[in-house]
From Swiss-Prot:
InterPro entries: Aldolase_TIM, DHO_dehydrogenase, Dihydroorotate_DH_1_2, Dihydroorotate_DH_2, Dihydroorotate_DH_cat, Dihydroorotate_DH_CS. Its cofactor is FMN. It catalyses: (S)-dihydroorotate + a quinone = orotate + a quinol. Pathway: Pyrimidine metabolism; UMP biosynthesis via de novo pathway; orotate from (S)-dihydroorotate (quinone route): step 1/1. GO terms for molecular function: dihydroorotate dehydrogenase (quinone) activity. The lineage of its organism: Bacteria, Pseudomonadati, Pseudomonadota, Gammaproteobacteria, Enterobacterales. The gene is pyrD. Belongs to the dihydroorotate dehydrogenase family. Type 2 subfamily. This is Dihydroorotate dehydrogenase (quinone). Pfam families: DHO_dh. GO terms for cellular component: cytoplasm; plasma membrane. Catalyzes the conversion of dihydroorotate to orotate with quinone as electron acceptor.
Length: 336
């Protein structure tokens, strides 16, 4: 496969520049016959989850295609689902550059992007143009300059605008790169947010005559008590699924490596065990009451199987896709 050569060239570039260059090329071929260049035939392995039928259990995690610019090209690679975003009500530039770093030896990434995106209206226009026939998830967050106390309003604005176009909606309250965001994972703040989101979901269901499931994305850095509390809240509010996990602030497995001290969330292989353990504990706590989408450090068939054995119904990749390329999709879907 050609990807090792492509990766070698891309890894000569700054990580964000490499991402921009790749997306530039994908945008050029999206919706054209040249999409065949990235198309892969993968076996159909349908999974029913959250009331939806996924073509296969492997999805693309949020963060790669923040604005939904390359849905069709990414879909051609064989993903059973694609989660675009995180998107916010208003466009925002994100944090200052550099803000994305490779830990090549560990096959990890550290990012402090800060929800850079062109806003929810732009994303909706991109989604309208796409022809992807898999499940499209849309991951939503709050603008950096929205006070945390008013954060729920941003989620409700996004829900209203994307509801008609989303297969499912992911609520991102676990990015470490938006000040105060993770506080929405706890106690009254979480209950308040989930109550508002569930009420909005019911209103939108009545308006659009369709039910769009809601999944909440959680952090891997939760304590045992926090995890129990989160699980309890998700069940009480009849949330449809949970995505475990986002990136970690823990650097214990990458000490001494180049870029290890950069501020931000760590993803990729160093996150693998930590996220799997959260899934295992969450699965015990939930006891089948809602499905888990497992994400964090999946870079092989074995790693994907571990997530499913721990209790995940579906899995997602991001950093592993950067390091291994499209062949990883086919490999996982074929052998999972």
């Amino acid at each position: 496969m050609y990807y090792p050569f492509v990766r070698k060239a891309l890894f000569q570039l700054d990580p964000e520049r490499a991402h921009e260059f790749t997306f530039q090329q994908l945008r050029r071929i999206t919706g054209t016959p040249f999409e065949a260049l990235v198309r892969q035939k993968v076996p159909a392995k349908p999974v029913n989850c959250m009331g939806l039928t996924f073509k296969n259990p492997l999805g693309l995690a949020a963060g790669l295609d923040k604005d939904g610019e390359c849905i069709d090209a990414l879909g051609a690679m064989g993903f059973g689902s694609i989660e675009i975003g995180t998107v916010t009500p208003r466009p925002q530039p994100g944090n200052d550059k550099p803000r994305l770093f490779r830990l090549v030896d560990a096959e990890g990434l550290i990012n402090r992007m800060g929800f850079n995106n062109f806003g929810v209206d732009n994303l909706v226009e991109n989604v309208k143009k796409a022809h992807y026939d898999g499940v499209l998830g849309i991951n939503i967050g709050k603008n950096k300059d929205t006070p945390v106390e008013q954060g729920k309003d941003d989620y409700l604005i996004c829900m209203e605008k994307i509801y008609a176009y989303a297969g499912y909606i992911a609520i991102n309250i676990s990015s470490p790169n938006t000040p105060g965001l993770r506080t929405l994972q706890y106690g009254e703040a979480l209950d308040d947010l989930l109550t508002a989101i569930k009420n909005k979901q019911n209103d939108l269901q009545a308006m659009h005559h369709k039910y769009v499931p809601i999944a909440v994305k959680i952090a891997p850095d939760l304590s045992e008590d926090e995890l129990i509390q989160v699980a309890d809240s998700l069940v009480r509010h009849n949330i449809d699924g949970v995505i475990a996990t986002n990136t970690t602030l823990d650097r214990s497995l990458v000490q001494g490596m180049k870029n290890c001290d950069q501020t931000g969330g760590l993803s990729g292989r160093p996150l693998q065990l930590k996220s799997t353990e959260i899934i295992r504990r969450l699965s015990l706590e939930l006891n089948g009451r809602l499905p888990i989408i497992g994400v964090g450090g999946i870079d092989s068939v074995i790693a994907a199987r571990e997530k499913i054995a721990a209790g995940a119904s579906l899995v997602q990749i991001y950093s592993g896709f950067i390091f291994k390329g499209p062949p990883l999709i086919k490999e996982i879907v074929t052998h999972i």
